[in-house]
């Protein structure tokens, strides 16, 4: 049975960038990757009410730069910046290097896949009907500029005994078009019946990725004369003669010269 490839991993280095941007040798790679996973889990739990979409981690020389994308940056910063300072201190303790924290605002949270998935899971935990939550999220996304959206929920929906999967789609969601900007996210709702998984795909239009448009080189026509001319070539030759094969060349015909004096041709 066919399976869906991860849309973000499928488009890395084509139209998407990595969420962890650093280089490490073989000895340190696993430890640094595990550190990034722990930092993201901590931020997700700590900033649960701040509507965090994604976290980008960069590691310039013996430092760390963490960019938090949130639709509610005021909740992350706190009163007079108190919360952000406490957050920075905890991150420095976890990572062991100086940490710089940047906050980026998400302008349209209704079209961000991670925020849509988190919103649906929160509604499922409050016992709201899953169909109502999914359709409301799709309507808001299409109203604010998304060209297509697909939402899938799986688990004991509405508390039924047998788990099932249901999905809804509106608009276009071209998963195998590399230039398509597909925002993908997952989330889990922890209900009294068990865990319900939610997946969201949002199609935001086509992009060439990092604004690197392909450069088309101009092909100039080669005007140098060809060495071996074809038999039917009508270009003039060096001796001034030319024409197609079989055509009469210039010059007088044989026997068509001037008659000698006193003689007439019969």
Curated annotation (Swiss-Prot):
Domain KH type-2 intervals: 39-107
Pfam families, alphabetized: KH_2, Ribosomal_S3_C
GO MF entries: mRNA binding; rRNA binding; structural constituent of ribosome
InterPro entries in the record: KH_dom (IPR004087), KH_dom-like_a/b (IPR015946), KH_dom_type_2 (IPR004044), KH_sf_prok-type (IPR009019), Ribosomal_S3_C_sf (IPR036419), Ribosomal_uS3_bac-typ (IPR005704), Ribosomal_uS3_C (IPR001351), Ribosomal_uS3_CS (IPR018280)
GO biological process, one term: translation
UniProt xrefs under CDD domains: KH-II_30S_S3
Gene3D superfamilies per the UniProt record, alphabetical: 3.30.300.20, Ribosomal protein S3, C-terminal domain (3.30.1140.32)
Family annotation (SMART domains): KH
Keywords: Ribonucleoprotein, Ribosomal protein, RNA-binding, rRNA-binding
A GO cellular component annotation in the UniProt record: cytosolic small ribosomal subunit
Annotated segments matching region Disordered: 214-266
Domain of life: Bacteria
Compositionally biased intervals (Basic and acidic residues): 230-241, 257-266
Homology family: Belongs to the universal ribosomal protein uS3 family.
PANTHER family according to UniProt: 30S/40S RIBOSOMAL PROTEIN S3 (PTHR11760), SMALL RIBOSOMAL SUBUNIT PROTEIN US3C (PTHR11760:SF19)
Subunit structure: Part of the 30S ribosomal subunit. Forms a tight complex with proteins S10 and S14.
Functional description taken from the UniProt entry: Binds the lower part of the 30S subunit head. Binds mRNA in the 70S ribosome, positioning it for translation.
Protein name: Small ribosomal subunit protein uS3
Organism: Burkholderia mallei (strain ATCC 23344)
Lineage: Bacteria, Pseudomonadati, Pseudomonadota, Betaproteobacteria, Burkholderiales
